[in-house]
Amino acid sequence: MIRVYRIVRKPYSRTPLDGEGPYRFGGRWSSPGTRVAYLAEHLSLAMIEYFVHIEASDPPKDLVVVAADIPDNVSRVVLTPRTLPPNWRPVPAPPSLAAIGDSFAAERKSAILVLPSALVPSESNWLVNPLHPQFAEIQVQPAEAFHYDARFFGAAEPG
């Protein structure tokens, strides 16, 4: 079993893996209209992945971290930097990357797509397909309050 993580605002913590955000807005690995949930293999990576999308002058005050336990038998496909197009890290992401996640979700051949993080390529993000039959085997843990350390926002260390 592996535990993966997602940081969300509290109102979204009741259904954190429903894929609603990517469905509405898309992401690096999915187009709008594709329902997948983005998680990270480490809490620290989830922190970085969320942090790059917030306004440092007005960070959300209602963040929570959600952990999900994925049994070893849940099907997954693993892609590495070597198996991706050479331009997989830039911002904005090329549309060819969203096509990868769109195909993964539509084909429903596996429940998980493991991909390298564009921010930390040696670590992985996990796309979960909430429409795959094995999704029911994923155990979502209760959300816990989460706050970034003030130093992320330029606050000086005390003392």
Feature map (PLM): residue ranges:
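Extended catalytic/binding region for NAD+/ADP-ribose chemistry, centered on the ART fold
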Residues: R28-H53, L127-L131
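Generic secondary-structure signature for well-ordered alpha-helical cores
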Residues: Y12, V52-E55
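Short, flexible, solvent-exposed loop/turn segments with mixed acidic/basic and small polar residues
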Residues: R24-W29, S57-D58
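Active-site and NAD+-binding cores of ADP-ribose-processing enzymes
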Residues: I2-D18, S31, P59-G159
